[in-house]
Amino acid sequence: IPESVALITKVVREALSGGGVSPQDCAGCCVGMPCYGENPANDREIVRLLTDALTPVPVYVVNDGEVGWAGSLACGEGIHIVSGTGSIAFGRGCDKEFARCGGWVEFFGDEGSCYWIGRQGMSLFSKEADGRLPRGPLYDLVHGEFGLTEDYQFIDRIVREFAPYREKVAGFQRYVLQAARAGDTAAAALYETAALELALMIRTLKAKLRFSA
């Protein structure tokens, strides 16, 4: 948390300086943080550190999904969905009620995201490698990109170079995409499933919230 707050503080101060704006002239600063609203103790620590660091600017902290909604829908009613490294949906109804869906944690959530597709793609390679599924373009693509001479070398590469880094697992998605475009039907099916997962978030929020149209 302290490292994240330090980075945010640096960016805010640079933005103010670049715009020739004094902190005393700011009505407030809204900060969108991943995972905010999920752990009360962490939430309090984030608010405390940001408030101390950005004084005298008033600070308002929300989940980053809410910031995305505010930017994409100009704070109006509707549903904003994110599908990047992770996934989350955030919406506001016509009665100004808010709701979110998804965005739990990559270990068991983030369905439809690049991280989710990356993990599923790694599993798909293992199935194509040992015969549980017919070998498609993903098998040869991974062998070539990773310089594998034997299938099980994939395990050590993933455990050492990918598993500790969320963004690298998400980055594996590009191999799945290349394979799907090359005709790997199992890889293409992952994107169909991802689309269904994202659509489920939208349908869920649509049922939870009231909209004027």
What is the predicted function of each stretch?
Residues G37-R135:
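Phosphate-binding/catalytic loop of phosphoryl-transfer enzymes
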Residues C29-P34:
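Short glycine-rich or small-residue beta-strand-to-loop segments that form or flank ligand, phosphate
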Residues I1-G28, L49-V57, G71-I79, S123-A213:
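ATP-binding/phosphotransfer module of carbohydrate and carboxylate kinases, centering on a glycine-rich
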